[in-house]
Amino acid sequence: MNIAWIITDEFIGKLNNGDTETILRWNKILYLRMATGKGYFTKIDTMNRNKAQVFKNLNLKVHASNLCNEVNLPANDEYSFTCVIINANLTLWDSFPKHLFHVLHIMQDCNVSNYIDILNKKTGINAIFLSKVKKFTEDFRAVGTGVCGWHSLLMQKHLVYGSMESMLLNEQIFSRMQADLNEANVWLAEVLGVPEGNKRAGIMLRNATTMMMPPTKSSAELSRNSPTESINPETALIKVKESVGGDLLRINTEFLKLMKEKGMYNDNEVERIMSNKGSVQDCDWLTQHEKDVFRIAFEIPMSAHLDLCSQRQRFIDQQQSINLYFSGSDSEEYIAQIHKQALLDDNINGLYYCYSSRNGRYERNDECTICQ
């Protein structure tokens, strides 16, 4: 079971003002999150400020996200939201055809139609149980295109995570996604019509929403080039992945290319990197720039990660499943500071998992790459 803390503007205000009871509760929250990795942050007032215009116009309130943390849709006595997702593999970004996002959006709308057809065939208790789901899907046809392989793409282009170049690419990708998906949404409305909920809101679009960033933990493993998960950073460049069929050795695709280019792909080097928890900062055959490019999540400034998430949220009408990563080298003050950054940023709707590497000690590069 996954749970979330509902964090309000009032709570954030009290925390900023130094309220003793609020600080004690905050410390308990951080302790539990670091101990278990769980307890999502649901900034409910922020989510309602940032929800899609359709739901603002109808005054439909968002109460929570989903089992992950990328959904920002309302639910009430009449509606239960549905989660319709498709993802683009960013390792193929440079070869994306012109109308890829248009096609992805149309595919999702087809999925919605198919889902409604299935629900229409339900009878008896099943029909009653799914009636609120069916009503929401029919009225709003909310969908969300996401991505996997964000960090893989940065490595592919030899861009440092959090650098000015990475921010420019971030802007380029997600602004294009928003524009293309909106074009497809308008076209579908003209060709196939506008659902009743959107009509009531005065929004003449086929789909109430178009974008969200789900975790893609499983789908990324099955995708071409083995991209990194969603918009989150790589946790280890070489690692053993446990599976039902046994343990599998996983080497980051972009780093494997570099190893082969430099003639360093051998068992000894693989074992050495694995013994360093997938970090390559001790590899003397890498240049400093290459070491910076291939920093793993526990070495990347979490402030830079949040900055990139905040930047792209302007283009996303739902939200992102944002993970944070901390190691044994990180102080309690640093962990609290990063979480507070997420609380205070109105473009961060919430937080997903918190990963910790208790046995690994990493040197986190906490200097702003843009300022260097």
Features from the language model and the residues they span:
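Conserved, charged catalytic cores of large soluble enzymes
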Residues: 1-60, 147-198, 319
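Generic recognition of stable, solvent-exposed alpha-helical segments in well-folded globular domains
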Residues: 2, 6, 10, 21-28, ...
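Short coil/turn segments at secondary-structure boundaries
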Residues: 2-6, 24, 40-47, 116-137, ...
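Conserved alpha/beta enzyme-core scaffolds, especially Rossmann-like or related mixed alpha/beta domains
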Residues: 3-11, 115-149, 154-172, 293, ...
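Function-dense linear segments that define catalytic or interfacial modules
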Residues: 33-137, 149-154, 225-254, 258-260
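Catalytic alpha/beta core of large soluble enzyme barrels
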Residues: 69-75, 116, 211-372
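Internal maturation/activation junctions in enzymes
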Residues: 101-134, 138, 158-216, 288-292
